[in-house]
């Protein structure tokens, strides 16, 4: 996977956590059988910045843990390159994930698992949204997404 990791925090995200995000997302991409040249980005921000995204794009004026911006989303969207014309030579950008580093530690502590498990959870959660999964559509969709999310994290080794 061609993954851009952007750190917009003041304190900086450790090299270890950059590598973890890259590794877990490559693992998730393999689980979904995505082409190796799939492109996406993960941007680390603070609470103020993610609140701005949440307010401007979702109409919710408070911080959140992760926001996903899929390139192709919903029934009204169309493929820029048709599925028939798609080749391994053409990279497909699936979108962007924004993660609040301020929330990762607090949620990990509250839920009783490691910072790494929470970080993995959030990026896999966002990644699944970029790939068309949506837990907000109903009980069946929620179960499908959360089961796949848990399976990916467990198989990777980030268990609760």
Swiss-Prot record:
The lineage of its organism: Bacteria, Bacillati, Bacillota, Bacilli, Lactobacillales. Keywords: Cytoplasm, Endonuclease, Hydrolase, Metal-binding, Nuclease, Ribosome biogenesis, rRNA processing, Zinc. Its EC number is 3.1.-.-. Its cofactor is Zn(2+). The gene is ybeY. Single strand-specific metallo-endoribonuclease involved in late-stage 70S ribosome quality control and in maturation of the 3' terminus of the 16S rRNA. The keyword Phosphoprotein does not apply. Zn(2+) binds at residues 125, 129, 135. GO terms for molecular function: metalloendopeptidase activity; RNA endonuclease activity; zinc ion binding. One of its GO terms (biological process) is rRNA processing. InterPro entries: MetalPrtase_cat_dom_sf_prd, YbeY, YbeY_CS. This is Endoribonuclease YbeY. Binds 1 zinc ion. It is found in: Cytoplasm. Belongs to the endoribonuclease YbeY family. HAMAP family: Endoribonucl_YbeY. PANTHER family: ENDORIBONUCLEASE YBEY, CHLOROPLASTIC. Pfam families: YbeY. GO terms for cellular component: cytoplasm.
């Amino acid at each position: 996977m061609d993954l851009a990791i952007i750190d917009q925090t003041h304190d900086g995200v450790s090299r270890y956590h950059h590598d973890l995000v890259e590794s877990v997302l490559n693992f998730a991409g393999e689980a979904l059988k995505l082409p190796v040249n799939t492109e996406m980005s993960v941007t680390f921000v603070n609470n103020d910045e993610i609140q701005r995204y949440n307010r401007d794009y979702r109409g919710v004026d408070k911080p959140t843990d992760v926001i996903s911006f899929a390139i192709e989303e919903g029934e009204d969207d169309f493929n820029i390159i048709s599925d028939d014309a798609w080749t391994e030579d053409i990279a497909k950008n699936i979108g962007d994930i924004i993660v609040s580093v301020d929330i990762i530690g607090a949620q990990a502590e509250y839920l009783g698992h490691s910072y790494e498990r929470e970080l993995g959870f959030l990026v896999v959660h966002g990644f699944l949204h970029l790939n068309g999964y949506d837990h907000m559509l109903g009980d069946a969709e929620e179960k499908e997404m959360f089961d796949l999310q848990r399976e990916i994290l467990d198989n990777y080794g980030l268990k609760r």
